[in-house]
Amino acid sequence: MANPKLTLNDVLIRPIITEKSFSGEEYNKYTFEVHRDASKHLIKEAIEKIFNVKVEKINVINVKPKPKRRGIAVGRTRSWKKAVVTLVEGYRIKELEGQH
């Protein structure tokens, strides 16, 4: 269930800047880290308002924490949510184009 206190500016945390995520740009796919309580509808609304584009579909992945060690201390990374956003043909997010 979506958090009622979540605003559109709180939904998107950061774009994912990796080689794999940039390979999807030629298919109009952009990858973002999003708030864990954000729904697909809220993510779509935020992308369309912030970047002035039309969203075709959204795939959401809940990334599970990985075990990590530092000396004898054992811990885990945090869990987070990733959204792969597919834009309607002809739309681009210009702010993310030149970050290769």
UniProtKB/Swiss-Prot annotation:
Which Gene Ontology cellular-component terms appear in the entry?
ribonucleoprotein complex; ribosome
Keyword annotations for this protein, in alphabetical order, are:
Ribonucleoprotein, Ribosomal protein, RNA-binding, rRNA-binding
Membrane-spanning residues where?
none
| Pfam families for the chain | Ribosomal_L23
Concerning InterPro entries, the annotation shows: Nucleotide-bd_a/b_plait_sf, Ribosomal_uL23-like, Ribosomal_uL23/eL15/eS24_sf
Q: Name one GO molecular function term.
A: rRNA binding
A Gene Ontology biological process in which this protein takes part is:
translation
Q: What family does this chain come from, according to its entry?
A: Belongs to the universal ribosomal protein uL23 family.
Q: Which proteins does it associate with, and in what oligomeric form?
A: Part of the 50S ribosomal subunit. Contacts protein L29, and trigger factor when it is bound to the ribosome.
User: HAMAP family recorded for this chain?
Assistant: Ribosomal_uL23_B (MF_01369_B)
Identify the PANTHER family for this entry.
60S RIBOSOMAL PROTEIN L23A (PTHR11620)
Q: What does this protein do?
A: One of the early assembly proteins it binds 23S rRNA. One of the proteins that surrounds the polypeptide exit tunnel on the outside of the ribosome. Forms the main docking site for trigger factor binding to the ribosome.
**NCBIfam families assigned:** PRK05738.2-4
Query: This protein is called what?
Result: Large ribosomal subunit protein uL23
